[in-house]
Curated annotation (Swiss-Prot):
Complexes and interactors: Homodimer.
Entry similarity comment: Belongs to the UPF0210 family.
Entry coiled-coil feature ranges: none
Origin species: Neisseria meningitidis serogroup A / serotype 4A (strain DSM 15465 / Z2491)
A Pfam family per the record: DUF711
High-level lineage: Bacteria, Pseudomonadati, Pseudomonadota, Betaproteobacteria, Neisseriales
InterPro entries, A to Z: UPF0210
HAMAP family: UPF0210
NCBIfam families in the record: PRK05313.1
Name of the molecule in the record: UPF0210 protein NMA1908
Taxonomy, superkingdom: Bacteria
Length: 451
């Protein structure tokens, strides 16, 4: 890859003034060779493999960050879904496996580890159910373990039994963790991807290599600055500016990923183009949409502006890398985006509007705080709605929702760090309990029949 001097100067400016960073280098690790019928042996095998494969990740990231002057904010691990790996133990709880993941991740110094997961889009095995029922206690007794459940897909439909259980699991997690913080580490997916480097939804797919490096970049501030400094007038010109900026961002991520792959002797997997915001001023997706001409994110026109942004990011990134994957779009996590927080506090950005926005971007209803007395069936209904958007539109959608015990609409909750803070948003008063409790499966749509 040839790098021009002009690109280097632009990169320096992106880092110094516009909050550009490589958000994560994530190593995906296959755990199938760790399987044992004895859960203690399984845990030891898992610990040994993670600490062996991932031992140099943090040092490598620090070296590359210093070498290129680009912040690499997080180093993470994703593993094969534990419901698959622990099935042979026939244990009645997988909390000890989550604790092993936590211990191994801390031993090598990474920020998070994902893969305490179950893929149940068409049905739940006994192991899947054990894992899902273990999630609340696992989130309570670990610090950096992330969990995910894939409850639907375009090819399989939506598993409503799993949706109901997911709602109950999130509700229970909220009740036993401080201010529901455990729920910030749980994502419920439709059409989950196997190579996602971002938390909390990362897991290492069964079709992946023994180990692989996936990189996530982040540059909302860079895109906003590019629009501010451009003379674009029409939306066609705006899209062109975003596309060219995404190209530059992606080139940096590609360079870091290839270098990390070489140093760690692990194959380079994908580069995720997603614009991932932070609570810092100047690092907001919402402010990009406002720069396009919206007075506040969430007003009429927001979904169209977001569709333009998401598409232009993809087009620019695809030109810059032949290894684009993961989620690759624009994230809209309420608590992690300064502009989203302001729009929600103003009452303009609502849960309904966020749901509409998820139809055109990555990935879904993300980091949304709701009242602590929100019933489990309402959470399940929100998950089902979001999954339906993903299923029908053949895209990944997800829900990361936090019922905050003791809080109600008008309150706010502080999560800290990259997770930021969020105003508690209202949910509908009507009930979907009878609908959710019907169970069964919402059949796959006609567009699933592509062969």
């Amino acid at each position: 890859m040839s790098i021009q001097s002009g690109e280097i100067l632009e990169t320096v400016k992106m880092v110094a003034d516009q909050n550009f960073d490589v958000r994560t280098i994530t190593i995906g690790i296959d755990l199938h060779d760790c399987i044992s019928t004895d859960i203690d042996v399984l845990n030891q095998n898992i610990y040994n493999k993670i600490t062996t494969v991932g031992k140099d990740l943090v040092a490598t990231a620090k070296y590359l960050s210093a070498k290129y002057g680009v912040p690499i904010v997080n180093q993470r691990i994703s593993v094969t879904p534990i419901a698959q790996i622990a099935a042979a133990t026939h244990a009645d709880s997988y909390v000890s496996v989550a604790q092993t993941l936590d211990k191994a991740a801390k031993a090598i110094g990474v920020s998070f580890i994902g893969g305490f997961s179950a893929l149940v889009q068409k049905g739940m095995s006994p192991s899947d159910e054990v894992l899902i029922r273990s999630i609340p206690e696992a989130m309570k007794t670990t610090d950096i373990v992330c969990s995910s459940i894939n409850i639907g897909s375009t090819r399989a439909g939506i598993n409503m039994d799993a949706v109901r259980l997911a709602g109950e699991t999130i509700k229970r997690t909220a009740e036993i963790t401080l201010e529901g913080f455990g729920c910030a580490k749980i994502v419920v997916f439709c059409n989950a991807v196997e190579d996602n480097p971002f938390m909390a939804g990362a897991f290492h797919g069964s079709g992946e290599a023994d180990a692989v490096i996936n990189v996530g970049v982040s540059g909302p501030g860079v895109v906003k600055a590019a629009l501010e400094n451009s003379d674009a007038t029409t939306l066609t010109e705006v899209a062109e500016v975003v596309k060219k900026t995404a190209f530059k961002i992606t080139r940096v991520g590609e360079l870091i990923g290839r270098e990390a792959s070489k140093m760690l002797n692990i194959p380079f997997g994908i580069l995720d183009l997603s614009l991932a915001p932070t609570p810092a001023v100047g690092d907001s997706v919402a402010r990009i949409l406002e720069e396009m001409g919206l007075s506040v994110c969430g007003t009429h026109g927001t979904t169209a502006a977001l569709a333009l942004l998401n598409d232009a990011v993809k087009k620019g990134g695809m030109m810059a890398s032949s290894a684009v994957g993961g989620l690759s779009g624009a994230f809209i996590p309420v608590s992690e985006d300064e502009g989203m927080i302001a729009a929600a506090e103003a009452g303009v950005l609502t849960l309904d509007k966020l749901e509409a926005m998820t139809a055109v971007c990555s990935v879904g209803l993300d980091m949304i705080a709701v009242p602590g007395d929100t019933p489990a069936h309402t959470i399940s209904g929100i998950i089902a709605d979001e999954a339906a958007i993903g299923m029908i539109n053949s895209k990944t959608t997800a829900v990361r929702i936090i019922p905050v015990t003791g809080k109600t609409v008008g309150d706010s909750v502080e999560f800290g760090g990259l997770l930021g803070y969020a105003p508690v948003m209202p949910v509908k008063e009507g009930s979907c309990e009878v609908f959710v409790n019907r169970g069964g499966r919402i059949p796959a749509p006609v567009q699933s029949m592509k062969n």
